[in-house]
C-alpha cells in the first residue's frame, strides 16, 4: 500500500528532502519514490518536522503525473533571507555546542545543561499571536532561529530546540503536540 511504502522508506525520504533543502535546491526528483498526491504531504511534513533546524523554507509544492497521480518533483521556495538565516542558525548551534560539552555527562545532566542554557539565555515571547505570513512565517517566534539567534520564542521554539540538542547528544526525547 502507499502508506506502508512511505513508512518503509521514511528515513531515506527524510534524508533526501532535508539534504535538498539544506542545499537550497529548488526541486527534488522523487519520481522513483512512488509518492502520490495522497501521501506526499505526510512524507514532506514528517521529514520537515523531524528537523527543527530547517527554518528557512517558505513553502513546498509538487508536480505530478495527472494520469497516474504519481508525484514527480517536489518544489521548494525559500524565505528571502534564507541563506543568511541558515548561516546565523548554524553559527548559533556551534556556539551552544562550544559552551555545553556533553562528553562525560549522564543523560539527566545533559537535559539539565541544555535546560539551564535555554532558560537563562532566551526570553519568552509575550508579543502575542502574530499574523502568519506564508513567506516569512511568524518572525521565528515558534522555531530554533527565534530561540538561538533572536533569543526570543514561545514554548514551541523552546521544545523543538531542546529536542534537537537532546537527539544530537543521544538522549531519547520527543516533542508532544
Language-model features: locations:
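Hydrophobic/aromatic-rich core segments of domains that either
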Residues: 157-177
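Ordered hydrophobic segments in well-structured contexts
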Residues: 73-75, 145-146, 174
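Linear, non-domain "peripheral" regions
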Residues: 1-98
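Secondary-structure capping and boundary motifs in well-ordered enzyme cores
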Residues: 140, 147-154, 158
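Polybasic, low-complexity, intrinsically disordered segments
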Residues: 103, 109, 156-157, 168
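Secondary-structure boundary elements
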Residues: 83-147
Amino acid at each position: 500500500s502507499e502508506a506502508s511504502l512511505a513508512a518503509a522508506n521514511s528515513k531515506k525520504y527524510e534524508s533526501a528532502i532535508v539534504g535538498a533543502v539544506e542545499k537550497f535546491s529548488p526541486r527534488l526528483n522523487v519520481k522513483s519514490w512512488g509518492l502520490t498526491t495522497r501521501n506526499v504531504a505526510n512524507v514532506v511534513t514528517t521529514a520537515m518536522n523531524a528537523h527543527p533546524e530547517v527554518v528557512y523554507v517558505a513553502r513546498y509544492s509538487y508536480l505530478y503525473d495527472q494520469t497516474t497521480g504519481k508525484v514527480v518533483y517536489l518544489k521548494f521556495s525559500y524565505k528571502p533571507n534564507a541563506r543568511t538565516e541558515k548561516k546565523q542558525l548554524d553559527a548559533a548551534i556551534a556556539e551552544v555546542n562550544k559552551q555545553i560539552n556533553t562528553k562525560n555527562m549522564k543523560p539527566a545532566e545533559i537535559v539539565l545543561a541544555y535546560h539551564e542554557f535555554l532558560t537563562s539565555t532566551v526570553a519568552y515571547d509575550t508579543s502575542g499571536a502574530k499574523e502568519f505570513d506564508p513567506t516569512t512565517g511568524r518572525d521565528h517566534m515558534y522555531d530554533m532561529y527565534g530561540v538561538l539567534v533572536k533569543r526570543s520564542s514561545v514554548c514551541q521554539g523552546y521544545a523543538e530546540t531542546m529536542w534537537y540538542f537532546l537527539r544530537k547528544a543521544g538522549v531519547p526525547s520527543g516533542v508532544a503536540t
